[in-house]
C-alpha cells in the first residue's frame, strides 16, 4: 500500500509540475520576456549540468529551458584518474555550439564547475595549475565569471588539518591566476563561517571567494541563516541552494527558503542560486520532476513568479 501511495504521489507531483510549467510558458513569448525580466532580477536560478545527467552535453540547455531555469552551470567534464579534465570545450567548435545553444534558449552560463575535485585531491595533483588554467580558459571562452572548486573528501580541512598549509599555498597560486584573468574561483569547504573567513584571510586573494552550499551547515546542524550573515555578501560569490537528497525543497522542514531570501535581502547579496541536489529520494533520477519542481519553487520565492 505504501508503495502504491508513493507512486500515486509522484505521478500527481509530476502532473502538477507539467501543468504549472505549461501555464508559465504559455504566458511568455518564446521565452524572450522571461530572459529580459531575469536580466533585471536580483536572483537568478540555474541547474548543474552533471546533476541533470547532461554533463557537457548540448542538450542541457533545452532541458533547463524546459525546467524554467535561467542558466546552466557547465562542468569541466570528468576527471577521475585522468591527467586532465575530459573537456570538449577546449575546442572552438564546441565553444561556438554551446554559446549558440545557450542564446537560442535565452540562457546564461554563470559558472564553470570543476566537480571532479569532489573526489580528487586538489593538494595531491602535481598539475593543479594546468587543471585550473584549463578551467579559466574555458570560463573566458564561455563568458563565465565564476569557477566552482569543491574542496572535497581529501581536502576536507576538518578531517585533514595537516594539508592546510599546502592547500593555502596552492589556492594563493590559483588565486593569482584567476585575478590576472579577471575571474573568481569559488571554493566549497566543510568549515563553518568563522573557519571560512579565517581561510580566506590566509589565502588573501580577491579572486578566491566562498561558493556556499546549504547542504554543509544543514548536515552539520549549524545555523544556516547566521552563517550567511557572518560571511557577508562580499565573501560569497555563488550558492548551491539545495540540501541532501531526501525531499524536494518545498517539503524540506529544516530549510526555510523564505528566511533564506529575507537573510540575503538584508545582506544586500544578489546573484545565482544553483540547484544541485534536494531530489526526492524515492525517485532521484526523475530529472524533470525533481529539478522542475525545485526551480519553480525557487522562482516563486526569489523572483515572485506564480504558477
Where are these regions (language model features)?
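Glycine-rich, proline-tolerant flexible connector loops at the mouths of alpha/beta enzymes
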Residues: 75-99, 151-159
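Bacterial N-terminal signal peptides
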Residues: 13-24
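Charged helix-capping and loop-helix junction motifs
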Residues: 88-95, 125-133, 161-171, 223-229, ...
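Histidine-acidic metal/acid-base catalytic patches
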Residues: 28-46, 51-70, 105, 193-307
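Active-site acidic/histidine proton-transfer and metal-coordination neighborhood
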Residues: 22, 101-105, 118-210, 218-219, ...
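A short acidic, helix-capping loop that chelates divalent metal ions and anchors anionic groups
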Residues: 80-85, 118-122, 155-160, 219-221, ...
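Bacterial N-terminal signal peptides that target proteins for export
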Residues: 2-13
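Conserved beta-strand positions in the central sheet of alpha/beta enzyme cores
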Residues: 73, 111-113, 148, 186, ...
Amino acid at each position: 500500500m505504501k508503495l502504491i501511495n508513493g507512486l500515486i504521489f509522484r505521478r500527481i507531483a509530476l502532473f502538477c509540475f507539467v501543468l504549472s510549467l505549461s501555464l508559465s510558458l504559455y504566458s511568455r513569448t518564446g521565452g524572450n520576456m522571461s530572459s529580459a525580466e531575469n536580466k533585471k532580477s536580483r536572483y537568478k536560478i540555474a541547474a548543474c549540468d552533471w546533476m541533470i545527467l547532461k554533463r557537457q552535453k548540448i542538450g542541457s540547455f533545452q532541458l533547463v529551458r524546459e525546467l524554467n531555469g535561467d542558466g546552466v552551470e557547465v562542468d569541466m567534464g570528468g576527471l577521475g584518474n585522468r591527467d586532465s579534465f575530459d573537456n570538449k570545450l577546449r575546442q572552438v567548435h564546441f565553444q561556438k555550439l554551446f554559446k549558440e545553444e545557450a542564446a537560442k534558449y535565452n540562457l546564461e552560463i554563470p559558472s564553470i564547475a570543476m566537480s571532479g575535485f569532489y573526489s580528487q585531491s586538489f593538494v595531491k595533483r602535481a598539475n593543479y595549475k594546468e587543471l585550473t588554467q584549463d578551467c579559466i580558459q574555458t570560463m573566458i571562452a564561455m563568458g563565465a565569471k565564476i569557477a566552482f572548486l569543491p574542496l572535497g573528501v581529501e581536502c576536507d580541512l576538518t578531517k585533514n588539518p595537516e594539508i592546510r598549509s599546502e592547500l593555502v599555498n596552492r589556492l594563493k597560486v590559483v588565486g593569482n591566476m584567476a585575478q590576472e584573468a579577471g575571474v573568481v574561483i569559488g571554493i566549497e569547504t566543510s568549515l563553518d563561517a568563522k573557519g571560512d573567513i579565517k581561510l580566506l584571510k590566509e589565502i588573501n586573494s580577491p579572486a578566491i571567494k566562498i561558493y556556499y552550499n546549504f547542504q554543509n551547515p544543514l548536515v552539520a546542524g549549524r545555523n544556516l541563516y547566521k552563517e550567511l550573515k557572518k560571511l557577508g555578501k562580499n565573501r560569497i560569490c555563488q550558492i548551491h541552494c539545495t540540501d541532501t537528497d531526501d525531499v524536494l525543497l518545498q517539503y524540506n522542514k529544516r530549510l526555510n527558503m523564505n528566511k533564506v531570501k529575507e537573510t540575503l535581502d538584508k545582506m544586500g547579496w544578489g546573484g545565482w542560486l544553483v540547484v544541485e541536489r534536494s531530489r526526492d529520494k524515492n525517485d532521484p533520477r526523475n530529472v524533470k520532476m525533481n529539478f522542475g519542481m525545485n526551480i519553480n519553487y525557487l522562482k516563486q520565492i526569489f523572483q515572485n513568479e506564480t504558477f
